[in-house]
C-alpha cells in the first residue's frame, strides 16, 4: 500500500472534502413525449403520470 510523503493538514483535508458538496448536482430534465412538459429523467411525469408510454400514477381531478 502506498504511504503519504507528508502529513496532510486538517485545513487541506477539509478543503478537499468540501469540493464534493460544493459542486452543484443539476437536475437532468427531458421533455415528456405525451404532454410536452419538462420532467426529471428516469421518473414518471408529474403532469400526466406516464413513464415510458405507460400510465404509472393516476392523476386526480383536483390536480
Swiss-Prot record:
Give one GO molecular function term.
structural constituent of ribosome
Determine if ATP-binding is one of this entry's keywords: no
HAMAP family in UniProt: Ribosomal_bL32
UniProt-annotated stretches for the region Disordered: 1-23
The record's section on PANTHER family has:
50S RIBOSOMAL PROTEIN L32, LARGE RIBOSOMAL SUBUNIT PROTEIN BL32
To which protein family does this belong? Belongs to the bacterial ribosomal protein bL32 family.
Q: Which UniProt keywords apply?
A: Ribonucleoprotein, Ribosomal protein
NCBIfam families to which the protein is assigned, alphabetical: rpmF_bact (TIGR01031)
Q: Which gene encodes it?
A: rpmF
The record's Pfam families line, in alphabetical order, gives: Ribosomal_L32p
Q: Compositionally biased, Basic residues: which spans?
A: 7-18
Protein name, per record: Large ribosomal subunit protein bL32
Lineage start: Bacteria, Pseudomonadati, Chlorobiota, Chlorobiia, Chlorobiales
Q: Which GO terms describe its biological process?
A: translation
Entry-linked InterPro entries: Ribosomal_bL32 (IPR002677), Ribosomal_bL32_bact (IPR044957), Ribosomal_zn-bd (IPR011332)
Would you tell me the Gene Ontology cellular component terms? large ribosomal subunit
Amino acid at each position: 500500500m502506498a504511504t503519504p510523503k507528508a502529513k496532510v493538514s486538517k485545513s487541506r483535508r477539509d478543503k478537499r472534502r468540501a469540493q464534493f458538496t460544493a459542486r452543484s448536482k443539476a437536475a437532468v430534465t427531458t421533455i415528456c413525449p405525451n404532454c410536452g412538459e419538462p420532467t426529471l429523467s428516469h421518473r414518471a411525469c408529474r403532469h400526466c403520470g406516464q413513464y415510458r408510454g405507460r400510465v404509472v400514477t393516476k392523476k386526480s381531478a383536483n390536480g
